[in-house]
């Protein structure tokens, strides 16, 4: 019998330790990706993360939050952030407290898409154009769109500065 997500204890519960890195343990930068398909950080951020000061880490967290929120608000509404937070805590799903409730919603869907039957019980409602979607399908679409948006951001704002730096190094 499959575990039912609305029970107080679920099999996919995680520890209550705070999240110190965006890493989700699926780093694709080791295979040459410029943007990690797991955590959506840029390759140089993955490599240098442990050397970053708090301001640098915060800048990465903020960018990831802004891009993810942009994707999430186009798919669902968080109508009760308190209920969502309570459900995350009750189910021991880790989330970054200072982030938007839309990032919290992503954590819920990422961890529970296959077992959630009623999103409203978590303080969420899908926008009309997504109400017929299965949650695993929606989760995959969100992840794909988040990756594409992050990759586009990299190409627009980060890659040109790398090219400029390389060009300047050759001139000197």
Q: What are these regions, as identified by a protein language model?
A:
Residues 55, 66, 82-86, 90, ...:
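Polar/charged alpha-helical tracts
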Residues 2-77:
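N-terminal cysteine/histidine-rich coordination modules
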Residues 31, 42, 52, 102, ...:
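Sequence-level detector for tyrosine residue identity
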Residues 72-130:
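Short flanking/linker segments adjacent to small metal-binding domains or redox-active Cys/His motifs
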Residues 1-4, 10, 95-96, 119, ...:
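Extended hydrophobic/Leu-rich segments
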Residues 115-172:
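C-terminal, charged low-complexity interaction regions
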């Amino acid at each position: 019998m499959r575990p039912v997500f609305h029970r107080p204890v679920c099999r996919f519960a995680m520890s209550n330790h705070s999240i110190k890195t965006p890493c989700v343990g699926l780093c694709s930068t080791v295979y040459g990706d410029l943007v990690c398909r797991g955590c959506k950080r840029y390759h140089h951020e993955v490599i240098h993360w442990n050397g970053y000061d708090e301001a640098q880490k915060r800048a990465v967290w903020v960018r990831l939050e802004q891009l993810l929120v942009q994707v999430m608000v186009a798919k669902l509404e968080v109508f009760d952030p308190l209920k969502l937070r309570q459900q995350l805590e009750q189910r021991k799903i880790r989330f970054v407290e200072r982030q938007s409730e839309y990032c919290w919603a992503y954590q819920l869907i990422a961890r529970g898409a296959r077992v959630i039957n009623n999103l409203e019980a978590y303080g969420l409602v899908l926008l009309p154009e997504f109400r017929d979607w299965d949650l695993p399908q929606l989760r995959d679409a969100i992840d794909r769109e988040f990756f594409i948006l992050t990759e586009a951001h990299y190409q627009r704002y980060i890659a040109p500065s790398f090219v400029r730096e390389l060009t300047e190094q050759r001139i000197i």
